[in-house]
């Protein structure tokens, strides 16, 4: 075995995530949208990298996830997959299917799922929705494409909700979410993201399923957690939701570095003789 191969870690698979749930090991997941960040996060030991349609917000500046296209998702996914491959190769890469790429018909959903998988070599896809997309999930998983579900607050349905408030706080909606989770599991999903739901409900869903749950604003009882990388790094001063823990203030760090650069250029302090040819 060559040195490069020795440095590669065992790649995280759907089977590994299932084993982690059964062994009580928590699953760590963050979003990634580019090559450099993917390498850093894979090196840091993340189990899963999500190429989220949240790129529409944090990368392109849109107010919702709806505008991003399949072609744009493929662009980001290719970069992330290359990053993981060029680092340890350990992290699983999951890609969001964007709005209206799987809702029109089962045939179109299957065609788009195949397109996304073939064009960048990711490990799995993520779809939002409950029983209304169960047949689609089954069709996609039946051809061998792993699917991660997403329930609770579903950003692709933001205009239906009218806000980003906590979902399933009332009895009827909570019961429906629990039912949807079981239906999506039966349809073949290997895991389900639970977003902004009461922690008590998330715990109940987690206990009721044999597949892992990944929480975002859903409490500590979930089998794992996911956050947007920009949020934990403090890159957006205007966005401070309750469920995000900020681990760094890169907004300030980057701004300070840029200001220093501007000053050095204006004062002819950069480049120095050592930085010139």
Curated annotation (Swiss-Prot):
Keyword Magnesium: yes
Coiled-coil segments on the chain, per record: none
Pfam family, one: Pantoate_transf
Active site: 195 (proton acceptor)
EC number: 2.1.2.11
Biological processes annotated in GO: pantothenate biosynthetic process
Molecular-function GO terms, alphabetical: 3-methyl-2-oxobutanoate hydroxymethyltransferase activity; magnesium ion binding
Compartment(s) of residence: Cytoplasm
Cofactor note: Binds 1 Mg(2+) ion per subunit.
Reaction equation(s) it catalyzes: 3-methyl-2-oxobutanoate + (6R)-5,10-methylene-5,6,7,8-tetrahydrofolate + H2O = 2-dehydropantoate + (6S)-5,6,7,8-tetrahydrofolate
Reported cofactor(s): Mg(2+)
Binding site for Mg(2+): 53, 96, 128
InterPro entries: Pantoate_hydroxy_MeTrfase, Pyrv/PenolPyrv_kinase-like_dom, Pyrv_kinase-like_dom_sf
Keywords: Cytoplasm, Magnesium, Metal-binding, Pantothenate biosynthesis, Transferase
Enzyme class: transferase
Organism domain of life: Bacteria
Chain positions recorded as 3-methyl-2-oxobutanoate binding sites: 53-54, 96, 126
UniProt main location, coarse: cytoplasm
UniProt cross-references to Gene3D superfamilies, sorted A to Z: Phosphoenolpyruvate-binding domains (3.20.20.60)
Pathway(s) the chain acts in: Cofactor biosynthesis; (R)-pantothenate biosynthesis; (R)-pantoate from 3-methyl-2-oxobutanoate: step 1/2
UniProt GO cellular component terms: cytoplasm
Membership in a protein family: Belongs to the PanB family.
Its biological purpose: Catalyzes the reversible reaction in which hydroxymethyl group from 5,10-methylenetetrahydrofolate is transferred onto alpha-ketoisovalerate to form ketopantoate.
Subunit structure: Homodecamer; pentamer of dimers.
Protein name according to UniProt: 3-methyl-2-oxobutanoate hydroxymethyltransferase
Organism (species): Pelodictyon phaeoclathratiforme (strain DSM 5477 / BU-1)
